[in-house]
């Protein structure tokens, strides 16, 4: 494998000539990761992992530290852009059948779960009102584990409730996990370039390849620059656009927010969790909302990879995207009719995609055989 990679580098990484802009999100994600590690380091210098000082230390960073407000807001907005890019990256993989490269896809799902854990721990650190209560609700789900649940939850909390030890270990985990993400990203990229990138047509890229640099590197640079410009526009004109208003108040265990919810990029999973009126069932559904992404590599039934020439599969795919948006929207609403019913229906549609897609692909095979 090492010899192969030496050849790839010496040949300036030959890739298919027809890969589109949808293939640019990998480089955008790498840029986001570098940005998050850099800004996170400077924030960690001034942050204090103590329940009495955490909120004040974040206020100190934004008010007193030179350029601190830029670091803090860039880190917060960067997290949102990170998840926008990763969700588009996953959607691209589903649409173009890139999951058939099993090793790359499964390493990507592992990366996604690590990233979500990192983002969750980071959301708790400012010790705002919504941070505290979201952490209480989500970590309390561990009590649903049979026999071991209470012991695991107590161990994670470092006591019988979320307190100072919890914040300290969450800070430690949030600090160390990005380095694990960097390692997993390296594995993801090595596995990808071991077999080579696919293309929008799903054909063999070996027929027509060009050097990655300068042809695709400049294309990557354009989308990455556009993303950074978008980040600076939000940072300059509406830095609190993606923040929860409740987090501008210090955590108070005696006052429960009217509607507890995590950051917007977790709302689809939270919406699926809320749609099931059972703690264990909801927790399993929450886990399956991510783990079900491991299914497509083993259930692909169509004889070509992408959905480019499959109108029925395309319709189902865009239904999944609409469902994802709808679940996210319902999760922002109170647990009352009609949002309960909408949430339950959209959750069923979400999981149905992964069952219906192989069946529909099989049907499309039959139709195409007859024509």
Swiss-Prot record:
The keyword Repeat does not apply. Its cofactor is heme b. This is Cytochrome b. A ubiquinone binds at residue 193. The chain crosses the membrane at residues 25-45, 69-90, 105-125, 170-190, 218-238, 280-300, 312-332, 339-358. One of its GO terms (biological process) is mitochondrial electron transport, ubiquinol to cytochrome c. The cytochrome bc1 complex contains 3 respiratory subunits (MT-CYB, CYC1 and UQCRFS1), 2 core proteins (UQCRC1 and UQCRC2) and probably 6 low-molecular weight proteins. Belongs to the cytochrome b family. One of its GO terms (cellular component) is respiratory chain complex III. Heme 1 (or BL or b562) is low-potential and absorbs at about 562 nm, and heme 2 (or BH or b566) is high-potential and absorbs at about 566 nm. SUPFAM superfamilies: a domain/subunit of cytochrome bc1 complex (Ubiquinol-cytochrome c reductase), Transmembrane di-heme cytochromes. It is a multi-pass membrane protein. It is found in: Mitochondrion inner membrane. PROSITE patterns: CYTB_CTER, CYTB_NTER. Heme b b566 binds at residues 89, 188. Keywords: Electron transport, Heme, Iron, Membrane, Metal-binding, Mitochondrion, Mitochondrion inner membrane, Respiratory chain, Transmembrane, Transmembrane helix, Transport, Ubiquinone. Its main location: mitochondrion. InterPro entries: Cyt_b/b6_C (IPR005798), Cyt_b/b6_C_sf (IPR036150), Cyt_b/b6_N (IPR005797), Cytb/b6-like_sf (IPR027387), Cytochrome_b (IPR030689), Cytochrome_b_C_euk/bac (IPR048260), Cytochrome_b_N_euk/bac (IPR048259), Di-haem_cyt_TM (IPR016174). Component of the ubiquinol-cytochrome c reductase complex (complex III or cytochrome b-c1 complex) that is part of the mitochondrial respiratory chain. The b-c1 complex mediates electron transfer from ubiquinol to cytochrome c. Contributes to the generation of a proton gradient across the mitochondrial membrane that is then used for ATP synthesis. GO terms for molecular function: metal ion binding; ubiquinol-cytochrome-c reductase activity. Heme b b562 binds at residues 75, 174. Binds 2 heme b groups non-covalently.
């Amino acid at each position: 494998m090492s010899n192969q990679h030496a050849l790839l580098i010496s040949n300036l990484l030959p890739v298919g000539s027809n890969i589109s802009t949808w293939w640019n999100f990998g480089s955008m994600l790498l840029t986001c990761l570098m940005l998050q590690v850099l800004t996170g380091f400077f924030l960690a210098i001034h942050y204090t992992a103590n329940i009495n000082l955490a909120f004040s230390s974040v206020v100190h960073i934004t008010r007193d530290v030179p350029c601190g407000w830029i670091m803090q807001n860039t880190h917060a907005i960067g997290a949102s852009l990170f998840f926008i890019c990763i969700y588009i990256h996953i959607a691209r993989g589903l649409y173009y059948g890139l999951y058939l490269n099993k090793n790359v896809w499964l390493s990507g799902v592992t990366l996604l779960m690590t990233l979500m854990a990192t983002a969750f721990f980071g959301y708790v650190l400012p010790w705002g009102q919504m941070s505290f209560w979201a952490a209480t609700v989500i970590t309390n789900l561990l009590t649903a584990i049979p026999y071991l649940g209470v012991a695991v939850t107590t161990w994670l909390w470092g006591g019988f409730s979320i307190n100072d030890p919890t914040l300290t270990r969450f800070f430690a985990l949030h600090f160390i996990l990005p380095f694990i993400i960097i390692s997993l990203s390296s594995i993801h990229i090595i596995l990808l370039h071991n077999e080579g990138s696919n293309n929008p047509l799903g054909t063999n890229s070996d027929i027509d390849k060009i050097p990655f640099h300068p042809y695709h590197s400049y294309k990557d640079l354009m989308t990455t620059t556009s993303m950074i410009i978008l980040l600076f526009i939000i940072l300059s004109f509406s830095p609190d656009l993606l923040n929860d208003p409740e987090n501008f108040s210090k955590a108070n265990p005696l006052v429960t927010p009217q509607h507890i919810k995590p950051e917007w990029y977790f709302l689809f999973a939270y919406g699926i969790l809320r749609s099931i009126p059972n703690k264990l069932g909801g927790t399993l559904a929450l886990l399956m909302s991510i783990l079900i992404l491991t299914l497509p590599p083993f259930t692909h039934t169509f004889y070509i990879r992408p959905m480019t020439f499959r109108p029925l599969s395309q319709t189902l795919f865009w239904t999944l995207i609409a469902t994802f948006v709808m679940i996210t929207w319902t999760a922002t609403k109170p647990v009352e009719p009609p949002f309960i019913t909408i949430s339950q229906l959209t959750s069923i549609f979400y999981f149905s995609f992964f069952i219906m897609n192989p069946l529909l692909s099989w049907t499309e095979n039959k139709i195409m055989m007859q024509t």
